[in-house]
């Protein structure tokens, strides 16, 4: 099955690497994180190269529901309890700064950027919602509790986080990637010190940023051993109502909702594979 975002955007193409090169910074991975790293280095005048195994935006980026929000579940109560106020404030500020940067970038990009309120709801625990509201108040966020949502089921409660956003990720990437130093169909096969081997060329870099969805190289931490595969699904429904916001269940196996044009994007069904 294809991605709605692929159907709605033009394709930006880049050549593959076929010779040896040297640069200051190598970015491995051409999703949202990698492209934004390349864009910021480009704006700062730092020599860089981005290597993407397939095509830019062809991984997680094209399959996301494309919400831009500081609200990642009921996380702030947990952050304060586990790590303290200072760390929670740092996390919040980093996300607020990122949202502001997206907003500034999208002013001049046709990527269907829309400001929306974001909601995290719970089906069975009003107490969790109240704890999160108190945590956000401590952090200076004007969040509100909501008891009734325009969803096809009742909820115990929800946290409303105002002025978040949604957009079209591939339209955004297509615009931002113009003029960037990118090689597509350039898979990294081996990394040794400051040298990276691809199928048809070697890249020597002073610094290397791995911006892949998971750590594909067996380096410090052996993170690949700790990973497991999971899968979730998103469908685009026609003739569905406008839910006037972005919604996600606080439970890992719950559902998320947002509109795109006349469509309702419904995500859920998260499960481990294998």
Predicted segments, located by residue:
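N-terminal Rossmann-like FAD-binding beta1-loop-alpha1 element of flavoenzymes
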Residues: 21-50
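Hydrophobic anchor at the start of a short beta-strand
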Residues: 46-48, 143, 208
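Dinucleotide-binding Rossmann-like beta1-alpha1 core, especially the glycine-rich loop
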Residues: 71-147
């Amino acid at each position: 099955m294809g991605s709605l975002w692929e159907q709605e955007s033009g394709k930006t193409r880049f050549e593959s690497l076929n010779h040896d090169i040297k640069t200051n910074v190598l970015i491995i991975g051409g999703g949202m994180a990698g492209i934004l790293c390349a864009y910021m280095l480009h704006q700062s005048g730092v020599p860089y190269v981005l290597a993407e195994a397939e095509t830019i935006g062809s991984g997680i980026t094209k399959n996301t529901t494309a919400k831009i929000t500081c609200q990642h579940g009921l996380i702030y109560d947990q952050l304060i309890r586990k790590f303290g106020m200072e760390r929670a404030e740092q996390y919040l500020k980093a996300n607020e700064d990122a949202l502001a940067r997206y907003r500034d970038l999208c002013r001049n990009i046709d990527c269907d950027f829309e400001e929306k309120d974001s909601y995290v709801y719970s089906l069975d625990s009003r107490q969790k919602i109240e704890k999160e509201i108190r945590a956000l108040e401590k952090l200076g966020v004007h969040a509100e509790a909501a008891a009734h949502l325009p969803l096809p089921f009742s909820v115990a409660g929800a946290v409303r986080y105002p002025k978040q956003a949604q957009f079209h990720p591939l339209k955004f990437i297509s615009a931002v990637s113009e003029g960037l130093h990118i090689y597509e169909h350039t898979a990294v096969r081996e990394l040794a010190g400051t040298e990276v081997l691809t199928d048809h060329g070697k890249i020597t870099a002073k610094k290397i940023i791995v911006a892949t969805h998971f750590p594909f190289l067996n380096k410090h931490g052996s993170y690949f051993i700790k990973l497991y595969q999971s899968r979730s699904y998103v469908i685009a429904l026609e003739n569905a109502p406008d839910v006037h916001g972005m919604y996600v269940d606080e439970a890992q196996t719950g559902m998320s909702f947002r509109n795109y044009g006349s469509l309702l994007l419904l995500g859920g069904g998260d499960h481990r594979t294998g």
